[in-house]
A protein has these predicted regions:
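Short amphipathic alpha-helical segments
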Residues: 19-24, 45, 49
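Generic N-terminal amphipathic, Lys/Arg-enriched alpha-helix
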Residues: 1-12
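Amphipathic alpha-helical segments within well-ordered protein domains
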Residues: 2-3, 23, 27, 76-81, ...
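Charged phosphate-binding loop/patch that engages nucleotide di/tri-phosphates or the phosphate backbone
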Residues: 152-175
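Divalent metal-dependent catalytic cores for phosphoryl transfer on phosphate-bearing substrates
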Residues: 7, 35-147
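A short, charge-rich alpha-helical start-of-domain segment used by transcription regulators
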Residues: 13-17
Length: 175
């Protein structure tokens, strides 16, 4: 389904490679977390979590849509709801950073609907967490970020974002 929405083969290849790495990481986290999760859903949703990138404007990614990058989660939700995948759609919307609160959106003046976009289910949280490890930057996709790099990136948006990360690490026995 991912290919259906990408006109540029370079953009498709970048997003597919990134999404495959996120899916593999999410499946490994789910397996080690000893929790009851839907592994099939995790793989499917992780592979589709960045489908909204097809509609953003980012020439370095080979995308020439109209929306800014931050909108790719909401756009992905729209796409997947249209495809009849409402649960997968919520992963798209809720995977940005460790999630966006309505307050984050308002305070940062983001071009997004002012609503809660934080991962709620364990599967959503695992995919969101796994996504933090990988960039979509061409030439840098396979490089896995360290937890210190992830923490530094999240700190730019407030200490409360690092608290969420640390809570997940503790919950999953990874701290």
């Amino acid at each position: 389904m991912l290919k259906k929405y990408f006109n540029d083969p370079v953009a498709f290849a970048l997003v597919l490679e990134h999404s495959r790495m996120v899916a593999d990481k999410a499946l490994a986290i789910a397996a080690s977390a000893n929790a009851r999760v839907d592994f099939t859903f995790i793989e499917e949703a992780a592979l589709l979590h960045d489908i909204g990138v097809a509609r953003i404007y980012s020439p370095r990614l080979g995308c020439f849509g109209n929306a800014p990058y931050i909108c790719h989660g909401v756009l992905g939700r729209e796409i997947l709801e249209g495809e009849g995948l409402p649960d997968h759609a919520m992963v798209c919307e809720r995977h940005i950073g460790v999630g966006l609160t309505a307050d984050d959106i308002i305070r940062q003046k983001l071009p997004l609907p002012a609503r809660e976009m934080i991962p709620l289910t364990l599967e959503e949280k695992i995919i969101c967490f796994a996504d933090l490890f990988y960039s979509k930057k061409p030439g840098n996709i396979p490089a896995e970020k360290s937890l210190n790099e992830i923490r530094s990136g999240l700190e730019k948006f407030g200490a409360h974002k690092v608290v969420v990360l640390d809570r997940w690490l503790t919950e999953w026995g990874m701290s």
